[in-house]
Amino acid sequence: MSTLRLEDLRQYSDSLRTRQGETLNVRFAEPRNTEELQHYFRSLSTRSRYNRFFGAISELPKGLLHDFLDVGERERFTVVATMMVDGFETIVAEMRYALHAETAAVEFGLSVDDRWHGHGIATALLKNLECRAAALRAEHIFGETLRSNETMISLARKSGFAFVNHPDDWKLVRFDKKIAVAPKDIPCASWRLAALSRQADSPSASA
């Protein structure tokens, strides 16, 4: 079980910088984001949606939308990355990740709005994910993608992931990376708050 306290989701928000210097706000998705999230997925190109879900969909089915917004359920989390566009907070990327405690691993999937490709948003999200995964006491992160998804494969390779054959589907490839974030750096809110929570729950804290 994770040490995250999810009563106030906004405390786990992070402010990142893209490769081009833009401010990227990363926060957990909330029920109030239902329409925004659906609009985001509808605005993706057909290819981007296919690459994200390994199938043809035009929007999130009702059940999957519920899962995306039910942050923390079964140790699954969804974050949205937003930027100010024409004066409005706009979702430009999303990432969903799940903790597999039995293997100390976090599995993830992500997408970036086609109009914002090339800004380094996915790279920033992956770096942030390492910290979020470490807060869950994971030791490595992994993802899967279609062998035809050259963009994701290139991103994973540049981000230091090792590639292995998928155990169940020849059309997919799996990539895995050992988490190399130093605890002393505390580069994200999730890690800092998890550390404080463990400290407060330790026997020495109440002695």
Question: Where are the predicted features?
Answer:
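Long, contiguous binding/interaction regions
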Residues: 1-207
